[in-house]
A protein has these predicted regions:
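Short alpha-helical scaffolding segments that buttress acidic/His motifs in well-ordered protein cores
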Residues: 107-108, 126, 192, 206, ...
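A short amphipathic alpha-helix within small helical-bundle interaction modules
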Residues: 136, 166, 192-193, 216, ...
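Acidic, carboxylate-rich catalytic segments that either coordinate divalent cations
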Residues: 264-310
Length: 310
């Protein structure tokens, strides 16, 4: 008998729903979110014909069981808003861990599998560095806002020393990121560094959080990053197209890269941006269009293994 599994992940537990093919109800069991709990779940799964597993991204709490299962089973990790939307589409509004697991098992029977591919150790290390740098930059930004509002010279001096420390740590992480990017994929890192607007930080972020670069179509890669325009039409109203969702780390770095490319005389994005402005596009819309064009160019470069031509 074929089974479909839905897993609701928390920091301490895994609630797992087991649905037989064609059924929309089934048993639900709880396991510890630990190596021992993962082994226990895998022993049970080994006795079943598991066709598809769906779980939500939960900020990293899912990584243990995800990495353990992805080597053996077809596992799809979805964004949490997709799970919420699916539950509401079923007309269910109760919120429990078991109910969420059952909804995900139902979803496993419905959606086309998008098999999760675990990152390599080098990619995982690089992701940690990119996330750590981002956290320190946010802390430094908060600290600098406090400095501007500070009423005590003593406290201001203390905050300025904290600022200097954070800046030094950020610089150190950036050096480690450049080294880790080369360790993850040196040829690809060198290829991307040829592109005007892409520096070492941007390249490291792309290697860490967009391993699909060069492996997906232009529409797919645009949707993954969150720069694909979606139509907003209802009745007689035809609203402006909007971007949504995607991968924030990659989208932020693409925004900065597009701005740098627009200012560069060596980049064709400068002319593309000016042409969009002349057609009456708002500046932000023109920048997002340049982000998408830059991403599609990078996707083609990696797919075809061609250098930057300008």
């Amino acid at each position: 008998m074929t089974f479909y599994l839905g897993i609701d992940v928390s920091s301490k537990t895994l609630d797992v729903a087991f649905f037989r093919a064609g059924e929309h109800t089934g048993a639900c069991e709880q396991f510890d979110n630990s190596p021992a709990g993962a082994k226990k779940l895998l022993r049970i799964m080994a006795r079943l014909d598991v066709q598809h597993v769906v779980l939500e991204a939960t900020g990293g709490y899912e990584n243990l069981i995800l990495d353990a299962m992805a080597q053996i089973y077809t596992v799809t990790r979805i964004a949490s808003h997709r799970g919420t939307a699916f539950v509401r589409s079923l007309g269910k509004f109760a919120k429990t861990d078991k109910a969420d697991a059952r909804a995900l098992a139902h979803m496993a029977q419905t959606i086309t599998p998008q098999p999760y591919k675990p990152p390599t150790p080098a990619q995982r290390h690089l992701r940690g560095l990119v996330k750590g740098r981002d956290q320190l930059i946010r802390q430094r930004d908060d600290n600098r806002r406090r400095i501007k509002r500070c009423e005590s010279m003593v406290v201001q001096g203390a905050l300025e020393r904290v600022d200097a420390l954070l800046t030094a740590e950020i610089k150190a992480l950036e050096g480690l990121m450049a080294e880790a990017a080369k360790a993850a994929d040196a040829p690809l890192a060198e290829q991307l560094l040829q592109v005007p607007g892409l520096g070492k930080i941007a390249v490291a972020t792309l290697l860490a959080f967009l391993p699909e670069l060069g492996q997906r179509g232009n529409r797919q890669i645009s949707a993954l990053v969150g720069v694909a325009p979606y139509t907003k039409q209802s009745g007689r109203r035809d609203g402006p197209r909007q971007i949504m969702a995607g991968r924030p780390f990659v989208r932020r770095i693409l925004y900065m890269a597009a701005l740098a490319a627009i200012r560069s005389t060596q980049s064709p994005l400068r002319a593309h941006y000016q042409a969009l402005k002349e057609r009456g596009k708002p500046p932000k819309v023109a920048i997002v269009a340049c982000m998408r064009k830059l991403l599609i160019t990078l996707n083609a470069m990696v797919r075809d293994q061609t250098p930057w031509h300008g």
